[in-house]
Amino acid sequence: MKISKRQQDIYEFIKSEVKEKGYPPSVREIGEAVGLASSSTVHGHLARLEGKGLIRRDPTKPRAIEILSLEDEAETPNVVNIPIIGKVTAGMPITAIENIEEYFPLPEYMAAGETNVFMLEIDGESMINAGILDGDKVIVRQQNSAINGEIVVAMTDENEATCKRFYKEANHFRLQPENDALEPIILNNVTILGKVIGLYRDIR
């Protein structure tokens, strides 16, 4: 869609004012911002922007200028229901119904386009040095292998899912917490359930 430089300036000014203040500028303020002394000239540009579907005006209200694209930006993002796992049943797929505690509506973009993902709610402070806090939910891509140093969700001998940094060493596996006060978990065998690819934190 082609608009003039002046119309672009007016459009961007209205958009910035709405974002910053929560309401649109007056015609006088628009004129001052873009160097137009005549209010009728400003009205003319607004009419052209409205005709091109970029704004909507209410003639009964002086400041009722609506930026239509802001409605699009403010739309609720698509969500996907991601399973949250708890105690893991040995020999069962990680997302088997026996392992799922509940489903969490995650904004689709946070799943990074992955389809085989699950979430694990962090209990405790074993990963605080990695910025993963008690109560956070990690987003995990299902996979059964990992590279040394990657943060994974693995299954312990007690069939509990745990989030740790993974290391394969000479004759054992080390699941390393990111907390200087805690000792690593040393295992002869380890079952990797997935790699951590993201984090969800509720700050309310």
Swiss-Prot record:
Q: Which InterPro entries match?
A: ArsR-like_HTH, LexA, LexA-like, LexA/Signal_pep-like_sf, LexA_DNA-bd_dom, LexA_repressor, Peptidase_S24_LexA, Peptidase_S24_S26A/B/C
- Lineage, opening ranks: Bacteria, Bacillati, Bacillota, Bacilli, Bacillales
Instruction: Please list the reactions this protein catalyses.
Output: Hydrolysis of Ala-|-Gly bond in repressor LexA
**Subunit structure, per the record?**
Homodimer.
Q: HAMAP family of this UniProt entry? A: LexA
Q: What's the protein here called?
A: LexA repressor
Q: Which family does it belong to?
A: Belongs to the peptidase S24 family.
> Is this entry keyworded DNA-binding?
yes
